[in-house]
Amino acid sequence: MNRLSKRKKILNCIDKSVQYNIADGLRILQETARVKFVENVDVAVNLGINPRRSDQNVRNSVVMPHGLGKKIRIAVFTQGESNVVLARRAGADFAGLEDLCQLIKTKGCTGFDVFIASPDVMNIVSQLGPILGPKGLMPNPKMSTVTQNLTDTIRNFKLGQVRYKNDKNGIIHAVIGKINFNISCLQENLEALVFSIYQVKPTQFKGIYIKKIYISTTMGRSILIDKSSLNVLIH
């Protein structure tokens, strides 16, 4: 009862109009977590861009310095025995071409988190667009998932590389780790994400680029973060 009362008291003290120091905000998330599974820590970055303008849309990827706390399952589209062996040695859970395409056609995405492809097989992989596209899993050079460098790409995703792009409202949604992570690790993951977003600021954009940053758990309330509490220079 005391634990529930403490949690309720903390929740009641959250002011949606207040910008919280990042460490304080993360601490509140940890103290109010109540579900029986280990929740993700989610981030919503509100950008000042006009998402209807193609030259202002933002997409990129970043390797989280402390990972994401989950095993990433990777499938690689490539041909030739040497490339298949290379991909598997780098950590791919499945590597191939015709057999992988057939697997997806018959069973869907089959639990894979990331699909990577060699450039020379994209003419075949593109036929899977109706299956992979709606789930955001279609290999794309802009997201570093169509590449000649299979080894480094696979290893980066295994380490916790996050792909992101703004939605129709100009908001970027991403996961920065698990709620049971150390606060400093979550903060450094968030700072890596924000810095990456700032690096791909559209060249023609004028105004406030990163307007607001919210953090939340999978099932919890969102908390507005004070941007100046991050160890990243942003505007």
From Swiss-Prot:
| GO CC aspect terms | cytosolic large ribosomal subunit
The residues forming the signal peptide are: none
Keyword tags: Repressor, Ribonucleoprotein, Ribosomal protein, RNA-binding, rRNA-binding, Translation regulation, tRNA-binding
In the record, what terms sit under GO molecular function? rRNA binding; structural constituent of ribosome; tRNA binding
Any coiled-coil regions, as ranges: none
Q: PROSITE patterns from the xrefs?
A: RIBOSOMAL_L1
Q: Which GO terms describe its biological process?
A: regulation of translation; translation
Q: Which domain of life is it from?
A: Bacteria
The protein's matches in CDD domains, at most eight in alphabetical order, are given as: Ribosomal_L1
NCBIfam families listed in its UniProt record: rplA_bact
- Subunit architecture: Part of the 50S ribosomal subunit.
Give the family from UniProt: Belongs to the universal ribosomal protein uL1 family.
Q: What does this protein do?
A: Binds directly to 23S rRNA. The L1 stalk is quite mobile in the ribosome, and is involved in E site tRNA release. Protein L1 is also a translational repressor protein, it controls the translation of the L11 operon by binding to its mRNA.
Which named protein is this? Large ribosomal subunit protein uL1
Q: Which gene encodes it?
A: rplA
